[in-house]
Amino acid sequence: MNKPICSTGLRWLWLVVVVLILDLGSKQLVLQHFHLYESVPLIPYFNLTYAQNFGAAFSFLAEKDGWQRWFFAFIAVAISVVLMVMMYRASAKKKLSNIAYALIIGGALGNLFDRLVHGFVIDFIDFYVGDWHFPTFNIADMAICIGAGLVIIDSFLSPDEKTIKVG
């Protein structure tokens, strides 16, 4: 059964491209203008700091022997494929879920690119209060988190299609 792409959630894949351009472009600027661990204050509580993340979120598993690079690459590909299938099966009118999936895919692919090309993910956004610093992150991480939040919001707003209607 072939459906026109514009009638499916895949219509929102343009957002994946936007996330990739913003993410990879910002990381390239960091690579060109920063040394590792160099930090530039922008405003109070916010620095740009070049860091290399060999693990996942919050450097989870970063201290392992290198197998995590391929593990997280596999996870990114698997999640991207599953979400694209879900988008294909969904109507283009399900904007919130399709936007959420596109943000997650864009973020996953942005970090996947880093893992495959550099062997690590380039992080540079550094929020802090006093001496406490939130783990450094990047635009791909933001897209994934925003997408995950939208999935949660959508689960509360969208009626459950499996619910049996009484009456």
From Swiss-Prot:
Single Gene Ontology BP term?
proteolysis
Give the catalysed reaction(s), semicolon-separated: Release of signal peptides from bacterial membrane prolipoproteins. Hydrolyzes -Xaa-Yaa-Zaa-|-(S,diacylglyceryl)Cys-, in which Xaa is hydrophobic (preferably Leu), and Yaa (Ala or Ser) and Zaa (Gly or Ala) have small, neutral side chains
Lineage top rank: taxon? Bacteria
Q: Where are the transmembrane segments?
A: 5-25, 42-62, 70-90, 102-122, 137-157
* GO MF term set: aspartic-type endopeptidase activity
Q: Which residues are responsible for catalysis? A: 123, 141
Q: Which UniProt keywords apply?
A: Aspartyl protease, Cell inner membrane, Cell membrane, Hydrolase, Membrane, Protease, Transmembrane, Transmembrane helix
Mode of membrane association = Multi-pass membrane protein
Among Pfam families, the record links this protein to:
Peptidase_A8
GO-annotated cellular components: plasma membrane
Pathway in which the depicted protein is active: Protein modification; lipoprotein biosynthesis (signal peptide cleavage)
Q: Where in the cell is it found?
A: Cell inner membrane
* Major subcellular location class: membrane
Q: Which InterPro entries match?
A: Peptidase_A8 (IPR001872)
Stated EC number for the protein is 3.4.23.36
What does the UniProt function comment say about this protein?
Answer: This protein specifically catalyzes the removal of signal peptides from prolipoproteins.
What does the sequence similarity comment in the record state about its family? Answer: Belongs to the peptidase A8 family.
Task: Supply the name of the protein.
Answer: Lipoprotein signal peptidase
Protein species of origin: Photorhabdus laumondii subsp. laumondii (strain DSM 15139 / CIP 105565 / TT01)
